[in-house]
């Protein structure tokens, strides 16, 4: 019984394979459109149309063995592989080239900065500058010396004033001594003291002649008392 069952299955399989016929693979037509493959015979074909006939660009099922198509010689029977990546736009290559150029500029700038930082010599600590006349050109030395002299006008003016006053007092003293009829003294201060002293005949008190309209004799001065300016 098992053998009969096996033979029956083999017969059904062979009969179904014989009834199906050839398989026409999918192809690309002349317009570039893909046509899906099919099994001969199709639904609208007769039962004996189990052979794939026609050309590489147009395929159909037929019963004539001499019209059979050698599908192995066709190159347009393969289905285009569907990729998950969509078609890239036109500007993508330009975007890639621009990105590479910008990256090259950035990398070059970083390398240049690194090289300049590492190869630049270290600066030594600057020592304080010393002022010397040798450091200035000869043309500027008169200006420096002149400016140095202009900084001390007060000392020179005070020295000149003191020398002038000293010279004037010396001249007045010498002119007073030249005249034997007058007694020369320095001018008294603008204040006077209430105390008075008697001058000794041996001591003399010199009074300038500018305070008297007439000449005085030494004897008249000896018997008079004058205010004491030393105690003030």
From Swiss-Prot:
Residues 146-185 are annotated as: Disordered. It is a single-pass type I membrane protein. Residues 151-177 have a biased composition (Low complexity). Residues 1-19 form the signal peptide. Residues 115-232 are cytoplasmic. It is found in: Endoplasmic reticulum membrane. Disulfide bonds: none annotated. Residues 20-93 are lumenal. GO terms for cellular component: endoplasmic reticulum membrane. The chain crosses the membrane at residues 94-114. The keyword ATP-binding does not apply. Keywords: Developmental protein, Endoplasmic reticulum, Membrane, Signal, Transmembrane, Transmembrane helix. Belongs to the shisa family. 'Shisa' was named after a sculpture form, common to southern Japan, with a large head similar to the Egyptian sphinx. Interacts with fzd8 and fgfr1. Plays an essential role in the maturation of presomitic mesoderm cells by individual attenuation of both fgf and wnt signaling. Regulates head and somite developmen. Inhibits both wnt and fgf signaling through the regulation of protein maturation and cell surface transportation of their receptors within the endoplasmic reticulum. This is Protein shisa-3. It comes from Xenopus laevis (African clawed frog).
């Amino acid at each position: 019984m098992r053998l009969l069952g096996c033979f029956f299955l083999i017969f059904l399989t062979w009969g179904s394979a014989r009834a199906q016929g050839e398989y026409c693979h999918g192809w690309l037509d002349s317009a570039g459109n893909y046509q899906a493959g099919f099994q001969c015979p199709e639904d609208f074909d007769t039962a004996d149309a189990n052979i794939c006939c026609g050309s590489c660009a147009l395929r159909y099922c037929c019963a004539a063995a001499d019209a059979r198509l050698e599908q192995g010689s066709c190159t347009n029977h393969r289905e285009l592989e569907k990729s998950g990546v969509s078609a890239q736009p036109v500007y993508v290559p330009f975007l890639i080239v621009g990105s590479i150029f910008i990256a090259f500029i950035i990398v070059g700038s970083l390398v240049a900065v690194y090289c300049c930082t590492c190869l630049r010599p270290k600066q030594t600590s600057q020592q304080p500058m010393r002022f010397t006349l040798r450091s200035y050109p000869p043309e500027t030395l008169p200006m420096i010396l002149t400016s140095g002299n202009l900084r001390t006008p007060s000392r020179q003016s005070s020295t000149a004033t003191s020398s002038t006053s000293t010279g004037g007092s010396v001249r007045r003293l010498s002119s007073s001594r030249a005249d034997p009829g007058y007694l020369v003294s320095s001018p008294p201060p603008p204040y006077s003291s209430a105390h008075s002293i008697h001058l000794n005949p041996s001591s003399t008190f010199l009074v300038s002649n500018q305070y008297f309209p007439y000449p005085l004799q030494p004897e008249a001065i000896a018997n008079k008392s004058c205010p004491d300016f030393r105690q003030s």
